[in-house]
Amino acid sequence: MIKATPAEEKGEMDRSEKMTETIIRNAYRVTLSEISPVDISELEFEDWVRDFCKNGCRSYNSSWACPPAVGTLEECRERCLQYGNMMLFDKCYKLSGSFDSIGVQNAMSDFKLIVDRYAELLSPILSRSLFLTNEGCTRCAECTWPDAPCRFPEKLHHTIEGYGFNITKMARRAGLHYNGGPNTVTFFGAVLYDI
């Protein structure tokens, strides 16, 4: 077995630290509010979250970004465990009031555009990445699921909830604010990646 020299280990650590700094800097560049690392070994893929998708979300079984198209929870787990790193991020939006449904929809659309920009910045510098975002995909007026392949597979971001992630618990563990206060809405996403 060949061991890395301290200089080689330091070089790899420096590269990893620099990449982490770049990922964080680009998060703020695209106007995300918060970002924090998540220990992939501690991820929990919870059945009840997937059941909530199935029973409470209009996007279930209607999009390539949502269950069942994203695979079983076991397939999602296996997909995630192929990566060495994960960052959870969010964006908090101010609303005009607690019943500002148009503000929520506009914020959701904006968040998806921000995640697209973030992916465009990071994908070229990461060896592999998987971006997860909130709710279903809205890129096309009508999704091709299940009759034909996705029209934009290179831009497809699976839903973070579709992987069975309890966002409240994940945010708390990562030190992110789940609730931004009165008259706000916060959306979450994640990037799993290898350097």
Which role fits each region the language model picked out?
Residues 3-4, 33-62, 67-195:
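Catalytic cores of enzyme domains
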Residues 12-38:
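TRNA-binding/sensing appendages of the translation machinery
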